[in-house]
């Protein structure tokens, strides 16, 4: 197998993480975008495929501009909500019951709207600024399509008390995979919503019976299923990524991370992140028969699509958080 490999060290990441947290706190989060870029550069540089490390080329200035847009939207929304509450108090001598429910719906609608916008912006920033052997990654997703998928999926998940989440996550994975490019490589997701639901249902029921202990097996099943149903295409070639993570490895990861964070009163969080990242990367394998040297930058000529006329795609704010 051509292993993806992560060689990051907990102590190195702790130093980076500790400084970034302090600077973000002192600067009232204004240096948070700089922290995102610094951490991405470190994590990418410690992740390799076929012995060659990935490279993150994103700029702090671009991340800062995207983050400031998020803050601006949040400030405007909060100011509007506060003004509305003050007007209601002045008009009615308090906040009517109907207004409380209305405000809750407005807040929910804002969250449902802003979430896919931020996901879209993050994908644009992090995917498009990732390179491997000078081969650039790209993200082709349209915000209008992601918005429709996200709002519908989240609302149905809420209305069905979480039952629809398996269908929503499967659709979301398929959308994201099909819109990510790795040079001449194309991706898709072949997972089944029904099979995902079966894994979730089994995990939920056995998790209750075993007082949460079965979550270890559930994590293993979800991870292996997701990786093993990720399909990679290059021309006429097609293969699935592979993972055979076992229960012992997952137990050591989850229990070890929980103890690490609890015993150190949170200071072990960076080490826990590195352990999780190492597990996720190192258990994702590419078939040995696939020639990594065949990956070329923009090898496949795709049909030009007409620019979307949807206002969301024209706006395309590229928020980053």
Regions found by a protein language model. Give the residues of each.
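Membrane-helix interface segments in multi-pass membrane proteins
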Residues: 77-114, 219, 223, 227-228, ...
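Long, low-complexity, intrinsically disordered cytosolic termini of multi-pass membrane proteins
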Residues: 264, 301-321
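Membrane-interface extramembranous regions at the lipid-water interface
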Residues: 1-18, 34-69, 121-153, 168-201, ...
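Short, amphipathic alpha-helical segments
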Residues: 93-104, 112, 116, 120, ...
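Residue-level signal for secondary-structure boundary elements
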Residues: 26, 30, 51, 76, ...
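Membrane-anchoring/interfacial helices and their immediately flanking loops
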Residues: 2-27, 31, 85-94
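Hydrophobic, aromatic-rich membrane-embedded alpha-helical segments
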Residues: 18-38, 150-170, 204-221, 258-275
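Hydrophobic alpha-helical transmembrane segments of multi-pass integral membrane proteins
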Residues: 20-23, 32, 66-82, 106-118, ...
């Amino acid at each position: 197998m051509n292993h993806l490999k992560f060689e990051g060290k907990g102590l190195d990441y702790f130093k980076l993480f500790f400084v970034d947290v302090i600077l973000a706190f002192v600067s009232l989060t204004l240096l948070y975008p700089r922290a995102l870029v610094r951490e991405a550069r470190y994590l990418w540089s410690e992740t390799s495929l076929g012995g060659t490390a990935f490279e993150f080329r994103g700029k702090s200035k671009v991340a800062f501009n995207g983050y400031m847009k998020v803050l601006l939207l949040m400030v405007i929304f909060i100011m509007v909500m506060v003004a509305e509450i003050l007007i209601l108090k002045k008009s009615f001598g308090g906040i009517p019951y109907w207004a409380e429910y209305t405000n809750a719906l407005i807040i929910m609608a804002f969250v449902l709207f802003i979430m896919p916008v931020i996901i879209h912006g993050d994908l644009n920033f992090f995917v498009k600024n990732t390179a491997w052997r000078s081969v650039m990654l790209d993200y082709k997703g349209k915000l209008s399509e992601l918005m429709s998928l996200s709002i519908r999926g989240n609302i149905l998940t809420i209305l069905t008390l979480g039952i629809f989440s398996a269908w929503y996550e499967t659709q979301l994975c398929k959308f994201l995979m099909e819109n990510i490019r790795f040079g001449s490589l194309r991706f898709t997701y072949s997972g089944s919503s029904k099979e995902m639901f079966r894994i979730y249902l089994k995990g939920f029921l056995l998790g209750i019976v075993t007082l949460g202990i079965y979550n270890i097996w559930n994590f293993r099943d979800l991870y292996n299923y997701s990786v093993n149903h990720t399909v990679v295409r290059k021309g006429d070639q097609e293969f699935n990524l592979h993972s055979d993570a076992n229960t012992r490895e997952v137990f050591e990861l989850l229990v070890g991370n929980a103890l690490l964070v609890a015993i150190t009163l949170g200071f072990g969080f960076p080490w826990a992140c590195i352990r999780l990242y190492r597990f996720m990367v190192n258990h994702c394998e590419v078939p040995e028969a696939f020639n990594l040297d065949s990956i070329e930058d923009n090898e496949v000529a795709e049909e030009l699509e007409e620019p979307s006329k949807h206002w969301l795609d024209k706006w395309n704010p590229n928020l980053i958080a």
